[in-house]
Regions:
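Ankyrin repeat domain, specifically the short helix-to-loop turn at the C-terminus of the second helix
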Residues: 8-16, 52-61, 98-106, 134-142, ...
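Eukaryotic tandem repeat interaction scaffolds
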Residues: 79, 90-94, 106-139, 148-150
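Ankyrin repeat A-helix N-terminal signature
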Residues: 1-3, 30-47, 76-93, 120-129, ...
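Threonine-centered tandem repeat motifs in low-complexity domains
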Residues: 26, 72, 116-119, 152-155
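Ankyrin repeat boundary/linker residues
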Residues: 21, 66-67, 111, 147, ...
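Intrinsically disordered, low-complexity regulatory segments in ankyrin-centric signaling systems
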Residues: 8, 25, 29-39, 43, ...
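Ankyrin-repeat-protein effector appendages
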Residues: 186-189, 194-211
Length: 211
């Protein structure tokens, strides 16, 4: 997989780097598809970065959607950040996400469900997700964004399965502004009520200090 020479040959022959399949997938989406590959290893990361640079040089539209759900590559990478961690804790998704951020991708793009990259990161766990959350917030991610269910990044953090990381994600949101603590979703529940329902005591205690 990841045949750099073939990619170069195709691009030199005039291949459309933004061409989509019937499933709305693109070349960039195919790279992200290897997140399911259990044989992907750390040594291939430099090759991935070179391929991404090649695609970008050939006119890659980094903010284009890559699937029928309306996800951009950046959203998809952040949504998949926990998959197939390498022995050093790195993930292919994080490699792609960080590359796209460096190239000034739209940190506030939404999919068809109104979800942003920040929302997915707030629901994720592990050091890579936390590191990316900081970078996304520094890139101007909207901490008040709402998905089609009226859920905010703070609510995604409240649902984080790793209770400690969820709380840390919430703390970062408050560091960057007002994540709408009093807001309720389409079911009439606030982040505080969601955390209470999930018996997330530390998260509840933290939110109470912000009221």
């Amino acid at each position: 997989m990841f045949d750099e020479y073939s990619v170069k040959a195709l691009l030199e022959a005039g291949a459309d780097v933004n061409l989509k399949t019937t499933e709305e997938n693109t070349a960039l989406g195919e790279i992200l598809g290897y997140m399911k590959d259990n044989y992907f290893d750390f040594n291939k990361i430099p090759l991935i970065e070179e391929l991404l640079k090649l695609l970008l040089k050939s006119g890659l539209k980094i903010n284009d959607t890559i699937d029928k759900k309306g996800n951009t590559a950046f959203i998809k990478a952040c949504e998949s950040i926990n998959r197939n961690k390498l022995s050093n804790g790195k993930t292919l998704a994080a490699v792609v996400a960080k590359f796209l951020l460096k190239e000034n991708c739209d940190a506030n793009s939404t999919n068809l469900d109104g979800q942003t990259a920040l929302m997915f990161l707030c629901a994720s766990h592990g050091g890579e997700a936390q590191d990316l959350q900081i970078q996304v917030l520094e890139a101007g991610a909207d901490i008040e964004a709402m998905d089609k269910n009226g859920e905010t990044p703070l609510m995604y953090a409240a649902r984080n399965r790793n209770l400690n990381i969820g709380k840390e994600m919430a703390e970062l949101l408050f560091d960057f502004g007002d994540p709408k603590l009093e807001h309720v979703n389409n079911e009439g529940k606030s982040a505080l009520e969601i955390a209470t329902d999930l018996n997330n005591e530390e998260f509840v205690k933290f939110l109470l200090t912000k009221m």
